[in-house]
């Protein structure tokens, strides 16, 4: 699934204007150079856009009036709009965000010492992981840079306007929402560059996390493009189980996937030498003590910490959530091998905002529901 590289020439809107949210700093400087302006003007505008969540050129008071007028003629700052908001009893907020005639979902998760934003990268998902609600919606398209960074921009603007209520500013971003980020590299990477940029959101590379189910060629590319924290959606201790619940494993098996992870760690400073393993706990599928021993053996050569995720149900799902006692036994086995093991606290499940529950509103170009009814046919995933 290849993507055209984003440039100022291919990010114009219907009215011929360039949405500046589609441009990272290098592209923004090229844009201002083409306007006959000095590169530092790009830095000024980005600071207004991301430090102050400003989308009105007239409010950028350190930019001269002539340039502001020129910008209004050729450019705009247009983030996708929130069309629905749901608030959980635990403080989690889920926003449905309009992207064209469809919706993706973005989740704000406040904690005592941080606030994490879970961001979507695609409308739907093509990977068909059996335990994930997003995967059941099918796949429509990749999100543009402006639609990815626009989720962060919109959330930051909402949270910033609500400081009087005590909401914590966003400190962490995780690419764990709808979609597989590595199948949209050419939009995800510039968006993450803006998250890290001092004139963007200025986040530490250790506080921006990309999660992948294992698109190995793209993971190798990622290591040459950007350094961010990495989480891998493993979810199984062997290929037999993973083939069933994470079908991309049939193309890139666990051994191949973990080898790519180790290659990424060799290039990365953000991960401090270890990767986060995500492992959803499915009752009597992958949660037995024998599975824990297999997982420990599997990961012995991969420096990591392990997040055990109680499965979050959705309608018509064929699984059950592991009991607390089974999760506890599983965790103790892993810790006996010396692995740092954390049982993730479920957040936002009362508003379907928890891990694996995001669905949005997807016009399915893969016609997945129809195919499943008629043929049970699996989608073909092309390498990036």
Swiss-Prot record:
Keyword Metal-binding assigned: yes
Residues annotated for S-adenosyl-L-methionine binding in this entry: 179-180, 211, 233-235, 312
Highest rank taxon of the organism: Bacteria
Sorted UniProt keywords: 4Fe-4S, Cytoplasm, Disulfide bond, Iron, Iron-sulfur, Metal-binding, Methyltransferase, rRNA processing, S-adenosyl-L-methionine, Transferase, tRNA processing
GO terms under biological process: rRNA base methylation; tRNA methylation
Classification via CDD domains: Radical_SAM
Additional observations: Reaction proceeds by a ping-pong mechanism involving intermediate methylation of a conserved cysteine residue.
Cross-referenced PANTHER family: 23S RRNA METHYLTRANSFERASE, RADICAL SAM CORE DOMAIN-CONTAINING PROTEIN
Family note: Belongs to the radical SAM superfamily. RlmN family.
Protein's recorded name: Dual-specificity RNA methyltransferase RlmN
Source organism: Escherichia coli O157:H7
Name of the gene this protein is made from: rlmN
